[in-house]
């Protein structure tokens, strides 16, 4: 290797370095580690990267949006002449701060809130461009499922062939009705408790265009839906008449509370524990025409291509009058299969591989730092803003959390990205 070869290239080795792959860190603009860590995780989610590069290829001169800026950033990384380096996502950050004023400052931001905003906002952009149709001067942009252009094919294959890859806001919500008949906001909280009442789970809202409406172009799902959207089914059994009713709800990610010395598998099992509705929380049974005691459970009906799991690491403590970090040890396996699926689940045996983890480093939501680890071609890499390092798979255990309940600074998994093996 020549004198200009980076340390990372030396560690990987010229023979083992993935062809046409690029490992580029992202420059931090004062407080943008929250976005850098999420962007790296998304870049190494194969289906997402391919669709963003495909969008770039189809839209030659698009109006500047957050999606076009993201596409430019991904394209810049994917077409670098060097294999390793760093790049400044200035255009993307500038646009982000214009789009959402909460990010237009130098305060500590929450990585999950950013992910939530980004995914929903990209979806809205796609829907808006689809509704605009050929009149926007970009007729190809309306084709979500067609073949890519030659440019798209070359870029996407270049990356895909080498890509095997707060506060803990309660604003995350579910649909307040049968999602199969709604394209509006999803705004009814879902709360599923285990036997001790200590573990809950919620889902990230799908702001609009859930792909099941009847209003023209909005009736077709976008590629954001195809990648991230799953379906939960809420099953409620009246204890008086035994009638079972169900309601479907879409989600882009699942949020789970964390408990000490547990695992993601345990958290997801508890997510589907049966909850008894009684006393002031009785269920209104349509068959009985009255409020009755009932049993309710939540199960997964459709497993998404990319399963994003948010560990709710920040909790408000009255005695401290502030949010504190919950650094409990939660094991997240390299392989994951969901067992809390419904009887009519579309793909109940789907097997997932851990692709990326956004990690929070620090002692609370208003202080600390975000980094990410990603899997690429069998290699594990750590991205810390503009720095990129190769790590061993065993290092992942360092980010499970602490076995002690003492509140102190820690480096813990915060957002997990699991990619379905059938789309690898």
UniProtKB/Swiss-Prot annotation:
The active site is at residues 33, 369. Residues 133-144 have a biased composition (Polar residues). One of its GO terms (cellular component) is nucleus. Keywords: Hydrolase, Protease. Residues 24-421 form the USP domain. Catalytic component of the Usp12-46 deubiquitylase complex consisting of Usp12-46, Wdr20 and Uaf1. The Usp12-46 deubiquitylase complex associates with arr/arrow; the interaction leads to deubiquitination and stabilization of arr/arrow. Catalytic component of the Usp12-46 deubiquitylase complex. Deubiquitylates the wg/wingless-signaling receptor arr/arrow, which stabilizes the receptor and increases its concentration at the cell surface; this enhances the sensitivity of cells to wg/wingless-signal stimulation. This increases the amplitude and spatial range of the signaling response to the wg/wingless morphogen gradient, facilitating the precise, concentration-dependent regulation of its target genes. This is Ubiquitin carboxyl-terminal hydrolase 12/46 homolog. It comes from Drosophila melanogaster.
